[in-house]
Amino acid sequence: MFLLAGLGNPGEQYALSPHNLGFLVVDRLAEQFGIRVTRKDSKALIGLGEIDGHQVMLAKPQTFMNLSGESLAPLMEKHQIEISNLVVIYDELDLPWGALKIKPKGSAAGHNGMKSVIQWFKTSEIVRVRLGIHPGHPIRSGAEFVLAPIKRSQMKELDEFVGFAADAVRTITAEGVEKAMTKFNRRAPGLNNEEA
């Protein structure tokens, strides 16, 4: 079984913030494949189902971003999921808006949610899907930017970006990380270089 985990923050006020892109991708997969992500388990909302013939668990840790590992590690242990079948999906301020980068391993690169996951699993060999959110112009505070609502003018691009990311995650489960990297490590089609 795959564990497809989107990182984010619980609460309506964060629902459409850049920091919650991971949650939005999990929601898109849930919608596409009729999986209800409503069951509480190990400080996460989870849903079990099938994507393209593969058993999956979709998860949205409810611990707040910086404690994500506190939810995912017990969840994996309880359900006996191999770490090679974990895919973590999250926002990345180091990448431009609309860029997607799949990596099979590596550091957290300053992302506190991923840092927590690496600390709990005691390995950096974790597949991750990084979703670029940098607006292409200087920002005063990264912390404020990632928690503020995404602009209404960006909603169409957001929808396309989330769909592109969901397809990337599907490809990881169906065809493997290498093929997914070849197909999806780029900007989502139809997105502008600058913030709208």
UniProtKB/Swiss-Prot annotation:
Its EC number is 3.1.1.29. Its main location: cytoplasm. One of its GO terms (molecular function) is tRNA binding. The active site is at 19 (proton acceptor). The record marks 9 as: Discriminates between blocked and unblocked aminoacyl-tRNA. TRNA binds at residues 14, 64, 66, 112. PROSITE patterns: PEPT_TRNA_HYDROL_2 (PS01196). Signal peptide: none annotated. It catalyses: an N-acyl-L-alpha-aminoacyl-tRNA + H2O = an N-acyl-L-amino acid + a tRNA + H(+). The record marks 91 as: Stabilizes the basic form of H active site to accept a proton. Keywords: Cytoplasm, Hydrolase, RNA-binding, tRNA-binding. The keyword tRNA-binding applies. It is found in: Cytoplasm. GO terms for cellular component: cytoplasm. One of its GO terms (biological process) is protein quality control for misfolded or incompletely synthesized proteins. Monomer. Hydrolyzes ribosome-free peptidyl-tRNAs (with 1 or more amino acids incorporated), which drop off the ribosome during protein synthesis, or as a result of ribosome stalling. This is Peptidyl-tRNA hydrolase. The gene is pth.
